C-alpha cells in the first residue's frame, strides 16, 4: 500500500485512469463486434455503415494511446477487406 501522500494520489489517479481506459476499450470492442456481426450476417449495407462508425473511433483511440496506431490500421484494413469480399 502507498505510504506517502504523493504515492496515495498516484494510486488513486492510476485506478481512475484504468477504469476510464477499460470503458473506452470496451466501447471500441463493441464497435468492432458490430462490424463483424454485420459481416457474418452477410449484410453489406449494415457492415459498411457499422465500419464507417467504427473507423473514427479506432483512429481516436490510437491517437489517445489506448491502442497502437498499427493495431488500429490493422483492424481497419482487415475489416475493410472482409466488407469488400461481401460486395463481390
UniProtKB/Swiss-Prot annotation:
Disulphide bridges, residue numbers: none
BP-aspect Gene Ontology terms: translation
Keywords from the named record: Ribonucleoprotein, Ribosomal protein, RNA-binding, rRNA-binding
GO cellular component, one term: small ribosomal subunit
Region entry Disordered, spans: 1-27
Domain of life of the organism encoding this protein: Bacteria
Gene Ontology molecular function terms on file: small ribosomal subunit rRNA binding; structural constituent of ribosome
InterPro entries the record matches: Ribosomal_bS20, Ribosomal_bS20_sf
Record-stated family: Belongs to the bacterial ribosomal protein bS20 family.
NCBIfam families referenced in this protein's UniProt entry, alphabetically: S20
Function: Binds directly to 16S ribosomal RNA.
Protein name: Small ribosomal subunit protein bS20
Gene: rpsT
Amino acid at each position: 500500500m502507498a505510504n506517502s501522500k504523493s504515492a496515495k494520489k498516484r494510486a488513486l489517479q492510476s485506478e481512475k485512469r484504468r477504469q476510464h481506459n477499460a470503458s473506452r476499450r470496451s466501447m471500441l470492442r463493441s464497435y468492432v463486434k458490430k462490424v463483424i456481426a454485420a459481416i457474418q450476417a452477410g449484410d453489406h449495407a449494415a457492415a459498411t455503415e457499422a465500419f464507417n462508425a467504427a473507423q473514427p473511433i479506432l483512429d481516436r483511440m490510437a491517437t489517445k494511446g489506448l491502442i497502437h496506431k498499427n493495431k488500429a490500421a490493422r483492424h481497419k484494413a482487415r475489416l475493410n477487406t472482409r466488407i469488400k469480399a461481401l460486395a463481390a
